[in-house]
């Protein structure tokens, strides 16, 4: 994977550090810590890897200054329906900080998140099953129209 999740919620401390080292050794370009990661874990992970350490932000109320001082270099905003607003909030306060954000389910929400200041968007594409289902539905409509 490009980025590897290395804990922060249930998994903390040395275990997150070891996972970060393994991820780096396997070619990950960055490691991601969950929102509730304790500062001590952030510090440990930042000390053991040379790749970017990314911290997940879940709302505009998330405190990030100490984590930035510890070595976080990118934030990953995942604030549900408030993602664009949260991106805007952090972009205004940290104009040069790289921000990755979830874009939401529509082109409009993705565009809104980019316009709010996200540098990159994470997106989960439809599964093969979903794509196949859509294709089959089109075939059924064509057949139905041909019979009418």
Features from the language model and the residues they span:
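Conserved N-terminal beta1-alpha1 strand-loop-helix module at the mouth
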Residues: 1-29, 51, 107-108, 128
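Catalytic cores of alpha/beta
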Residues: 15-22, 62-70, 105-121
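Catalytic beta/alpha-barrel core
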Residues: 5, 28-38, 52-63, 73-81, ...
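Generic structural signal for hydrophobic
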Residues: 23, 45-46, 66-67, 90, ...
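Short beta-strand/loop segments at the ligand-binding rim of alpha/beta enzyme cores
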Residues: 1-7, 46-55, 91-102
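Short, structured coil segments at secondary-structure junctions
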Residues: 26-27, 48-49, 70-71, 94-95, ...
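C-terminal helical cap(s) of enzyme catalytic domains, especially alpha/beta-barrels
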Residues: 44-46, 114, 127-148
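Glycine-rich phosphate-binding active-site loops on the catalytic face of alpha/beta enzymes
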Residues: 28-38, 77-86, 116-136
């Amino acid at each position: 994977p490009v980025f590897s999740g290395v804990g922060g919620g249930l998994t903390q401390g040395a275990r997150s550090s070891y996972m970060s080292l393994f991820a780096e050794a396997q070619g990950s370009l960055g490691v991601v810590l969950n929102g509730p990661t304790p500062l001590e874990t952030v510090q440990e992970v930042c000390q053991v890897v040379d790749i970017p350490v990314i911290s997940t932000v879940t709302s505009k109320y998330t405190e990030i200054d100490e984590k930035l001082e510890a070595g976080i270099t990118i934030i990953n905003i995942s604030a549900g329906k408030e993602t664009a607003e949260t991106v805007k909030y952090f972009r205004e306060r940290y104009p040069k900080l790289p921000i990755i954000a979830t874009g939401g389910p529509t082109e409009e929400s993705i565009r809104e998140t980019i316009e709010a200041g996200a540098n990159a968007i994470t997106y989960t594409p439809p599964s093969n099953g979903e794509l196949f289902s859509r294709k089959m539905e089109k075939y059924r409509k064509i057949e139905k129209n041909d019979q009418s």
